[in-house]
Amino acid sequence: MITLHYLNNSRSQRILWLLEELGLEYRVQHHERDKETQLAPESLKKVHPLGKAPAITDGDLTLAESGAIVDYLAQTYGREALLPAADSPAWWDYVYWLHYAEGSLMPPLLMRYVFDRVKAAPVPFFVRPLVNRIVAEVDKAFLRQQIKSHLDFVEDHLSCHDWLVDGRFGAADIQLSFPLEAALSRTGMGGQYPRIRDYVAQLQARPAYLRALKAGGPYAYGPAVTPP
């Protein structure tokens, strides 16, 4: 049976969702972030040397990195359901979006999150104006433009396509879900992207997504309505 090592409010949620989409038997091993630092606990280092989540074990295989896990599960258990044919042009569209989600879209979003935490961190009162100014300048000069460029790109693609690849829901949509959920929740830019909002709502309405919410517990980036 597959074991998912699940960290709250993380990329782990999309792996749980994928397991539900595939109808696989699995068990969830929960790991909780440190409430002060928001970092993963030491318990995850017993699973993988880097102590990161998500990670899965499937028989003798232990695998980390959500993109690798999505690809492994889809190719091993759901090729026809969630992947385009390997000899079709759509295959490379899948590969592109699989890597784009974490390689291009997620880094500026993560940087924005880090700077938000820096801005909120306790510092001496006389340092606060300087910290706020530095964060604001980095956001204005770099992060906001980077995030906007990526969200413009995704919005344009989704304006012409119901799903990312091959005209149907698939593994690429699951992989892209987390950065889009994070972008809508944290950037304050969601109002500019109606197609992204509709697309994410469409993902979050899937029965397997809702089952994953119940299995995983509270998820900061999920829909506002508690699943039945």
Give short role names for the model-derived ranges.
Residues 189-228:
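Long hydrophobic alpha-helical segments typical of transmembrane helices together
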